[in-house]
């Protein structure tokens, strides 16, 4: 009789251990604490953040956005820069110029501009900050424009031209950049 129950009990124990192991591999408590690879669905960027050699003429601390490359560079000392993948404005929405970061917000609220509502009447008129918000985990506001460098709840759009002119980053990348720059940082947008 004991043998009759021993095999099913052993099978259940094995399945439970296997499922727990798989869950442990997938679940990373840093994900919900803001530092793991799936930070609030920010996902990993299809274009990984990396330090590169940089021979541009911009001063350390400057952000340089290259829309044609779909990359953002934070100029560092010693001829280097941090390079991030970004999503850029789709055709008709790309722009260039020089601005300063005038505000920084964590988990920003979003109010779509009237022009966007006219194009997309299905959009909410206002969204509180959070994981469903298209501005993602952080936003840096550019001058007096409506444009921002911000996170995204759609990490798969990084490297694409899909926005209405803002620069999208994964939540991990925008959180990293946000911690490195301050209000007053110069942002150069190259639209070539």
Predicted stretch roles:
Residues 2-192:
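N-terminal pre-domains immediately preceding structured catalytic cores
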